[in-house]
Amino acid sequence: MDKGKAGRRRSSAEIVTEGKRKKPSSSELHKITKILNAKPEDVHVQSPLSKLRSSEHWDVSLQGWKRSLRNKVLSLDHKSKKGVRGHPVTSKISPERQLKVMLTNVLWTDLGRKFRKTLPRNDANLCDANKVQSDSLPSTSVDSLETCQKLEPLHQSLNLSERIPRVILTNVLGTKLGRKYIKTSSVTEANLGDTDNLQSEQLSSSSDGSLESCQNLNPHKNFFLSESSSQSSKTDNYAKQTSYTKEKRRDDDGISFMSDTQPKDLSSGSRDCDHLEVGSRNKDDTNSVSRMEPTLISRKRKKRLRSNLPDTHNPASLYKSAEQTKEQENDPAVFTELEKSSENYHEDPKLFEEVTYESIESDFAQLPSDCGQELALSASPQMTSGCSAMETFESSISSDTVGNSTLVVKDENELNTIEKPVLSEHSEGNLSFISAEPIVVSSDEEGPTEQKSSEILKLQPKQDDAISHESESTSEPVVSELPLITCESVQTSSELCSYNPVMENISCLIPKNEMDLQLDFIFTSVYIGKIKGASKGCVTFTTKYIKIPFQVSVHEISLLVDTTHLKRFGLWKNKDDDHSKKSHAILFLWVSSNYLQEIQTQLENSVFSQQSKSTEFIFLELHSSISQREELKLKDIMTEISTTNGELELSYPLSWVQALPLFQNLSSKESSFIHYYCASTCSFPAATTEEMKMKSVSQPSNTDTAKPTYTLLQKQSSGCYSLSITSNPDEEWREVRHTGPVQKLIVYPPPPTKGGLGVTNEDLECLEEGEFLNDVIIDFYLKYLILEKASDELVERSHIFSSFFYKCLTRKENNLTEDNPNLSMAQRRHKRVRTWTRHINIFNKDYIFVPVNESSHWYLAVICFPWLEEVVYEDFPQTIPQYSQAEESHHDSRTIDNDLHTSSALSSGTEDSQSPEMNVTVPKKMCKRPCILILDSLKAASIQNTVQNLREYLEVEWEVKRKTHREFSKTNMVDLCPKVPKQDNSSDCGVYLLQYVESFFKDPIVNFELPIHLEKWFPRHVIKTKREDIRELILKLHLQQQKGSSS
């Protein structure tokens, strides 16, 4: 030991090497014995040691410990001989003295002496004792753990310190790789010498025992120890039970330990415990977790990281803090504060985390590989499967991922995403100790590695063969599961960061060719022969197979295409070949014809009725555009396949123009790709044929078109022309309007009936979806309904006005054109339409239908019983199947809600007086009520104006026909708005008007007792087909009238 420097504070207990030991003085031992005799019940030396399985863990008996302690342990009063900074103090034992742990120097071998000589002594505060502390922190076993746990009072620990056994550590630098590490581990910082490098990079592996030995010492023993012991005490009992197996394997190799009574040793051991604790406590802390991942960092990055560390992370500053602790231990006031703070740490774990977070994080970054390996083997003894998974993971990653556990911020989130699923199934029940991502490293014994880096330290400690075999035996299942877990994360993060350690891990597990030559695409649809399948995952391209998961109807199929039967492929992107506006890209695969039977077998023989040429072609509609990187990788895969199969043409993709002749002759019935995809996008010639039967009309063609945009194919058969029109590959289908002369298709009713209505080919255009029906179609179908659909009895009782009637009634005219300016407004309106009823008396009818168009919206007004002046109840006719009778019996007890309009909510006094009497007889009677029904599919019209105009018209018409005056008011001619089926768009109002009339004729309303419910008058699907039904009716009548005229 260096004792020549004056003023330098001597260590509290010097380590004597090579058998030189200073025996404690007899006076001091006498004082210790006196203290122990004062409270003998507090000291039970044999009690904690009797619980240990010494025969299983220790080769040295308890007597050997005593003998070794007497021969080689220094006196405990050594520190009292020289105080802080050279000031002498009395040798009296202070009750505030901390527990000092002594470590035996393990550098007794030739290599250890050489190692001591190579360490420069450029720091006055670092001595040989510090080197020994840093070089030989022990791998603690359960025996030493339980011994240290029971050291509670200070005088007990002083007396028991003589009985603590020495543990000799095997030097892990005895291998060739260790000597190489010594040469390459120097750091150029001024305040970090080789001693600090050894201290930071070669801390010996701390197991659960070393953790618990630190946490169970009293908090007032050491400031650093109190911080780490507050949180780790929760895992003592659980770790004790499961660390037996691992410790036995280490002890078989002759690894042992010994505790010293030096404060700085405890601080170093406490720091190691902090390493372990942070990994277990901060499970959700991404910064701490990221530092526990195995990564490869360059020397420059490691230097930059160390230069950014605060002063508290410097070993020199740690030594200074240890000095301050030694100064404070002689000051009772300071000691009291430290003890209180230590107790607070035990009481408030959150406060402990806040205080120690920074220093613990930095210490984790300096854990060496061999310490990480020991941690991976012993940090999770509570669960065998968790430990096995971590050991196999480290053996799988091997040496390429061993290094200082530091990550740049860019990689942290990605690695957390990858690592957590691997450990999630093992993390239950290990909330206090096992973190989500413990440090995982690899040793040289667990597997040979071919790639080695000079920047990475790979120590090879002497381990039991059983550990290696255990790692190898348990590595196989985890290795097989690793690519499945990490494949997706690697693929998504490969473009985000320049370095991904998990990608290198997979490269160690999967052959390089198989890993590189695999590509996944997200697709939306697959077209194989006659079927179209929806995507159920990603299509996978490899050199051996192509996997296509898809679903047809309710059947899920995973098609595996053997690449040995692949003939050609194609990749058609929208920007290169503008054949498609629907998808970004199409992948085309052409398989050999002798492979169709295998495809049909995989499709369970339920898809194809027979084999066809179209089955050879597989089209994959990709979800998004393909990147240049993916395109190059796909070409590499195809090149490899072509080399294997001996088909050189396979390495060259087919363009759209080259592939088109292969399937252009297929019909839409044979190929689903042509039917579903190309019919709306590319539409090749002769592939997507849509036949249109038209009348043979010779018309001059326009020959001065600059550039044709479509292809026209003509065929004449049986006096009709069959036309096939397809757009060019770079064009879309566009709606073609008729541009020829207007042609009258039908006259309904046909001659010789008078009042026939003509329908032309222009009128058919309004029957397209989304178009408003014009007045010609409205009038035609209303005439058709009353002449063809209504019963004779109902025809006699009904009258339908033309769609122009209400328009003429409400038309505004110039006052100069009026013959008699003294006429009222109602009389003027009636005069405009007086000739509409010259051959009919509407007051002899029960139902008068008036189509109304306001602001391009169609609705229906039905004038019911205009000849009645009040409500009349009659018996139901026996011959009429009553829709309203059944409805009335169901709704007779309901109250009047929205059916009676607000303007006519009050009925006459006679009605009110009769209602209570007639409620009982309503099921046996039918009600005839004079009213105006408004059947509106939107309720968007000005109903009040319409109803008032119709009342005024009826009043004038009554005077003209009956030659008497009658008032049509809100009381005797009420307006009702029953609930009817409503439209779900903005263009079907005319269709609903026609359906209201048709439903009325089919199932008329004969009972007008309120309320009137017509919500289920007809189903909605009737409206969906009504336009097409009217079109077919017109064309059918057109053919009938054509045949009649020709004959």
Swiss-Prot record:
Its main location: cytoplasm. The active site is at residues 857, 936, 989. Residues 271-286, 461-472, 887-900 have a biased composition (Basic and acidic residues). Keywords: Cytoplasm, Hydrolase, Immunity, Innate immunity, Phosphoprotein, Protease, Thiol protease, Ubl conjugation pathway. Residues 1-10 have a biased composition (Basic residues). Residues 234-244, 258-270, 901-918 have a biased composition (Polar residues). It is found in: Cytoplasm. The modification Phosphoserine is found at residues 11-12, 25, 432, 442-443. Residues 1-30, 193-331, 440-474, 883-918 are annotated as: Disordered. Gene3D superfamilies: Adenoviral Proteinase, Chain A. GO terms for cellular component: cytoplasm; nucleus; postsynaptic cytosol; presynaptic cytosol. Residues 198-213 have a biased composition (Low complexity). InterPro entries: Papain-like_cys_pep_sf (IPR038765), Peptidase_C48_C (IPR003653), Sentrin-specific_protease (IPR051947). GO terms for molecular function: SUMO-specific endopeptidase activity. Its EC number is 3.4.22.-. Residues 757-1047 are annotated as: Protease. It is an enzyme of class 3 (hydrolase). One of its GO terms (biological process) is proteolysis. Transmembrane segments: none annotated. Protease that acts as a positive regulator of the cGAS-STING pathway by catalyzing desumoylation of CGAS. Desumoylation of CGAS promotes DNA-binding activity of CGAS, subsequent oligomerization and activation. Deconjugates SUMO2 and SUMO3 from targeted proteins, but not SUMO1. Catalyzes the deconjugation of poly-SUMO2 and poly-SUMO3 chains. Has very low efficiency in processing full-length SUMO proteins to their mature forms. Belongs to the peptidase C48 family. This is Sentrin-specific protease 7. It comes from Bos taurus (Bovine).
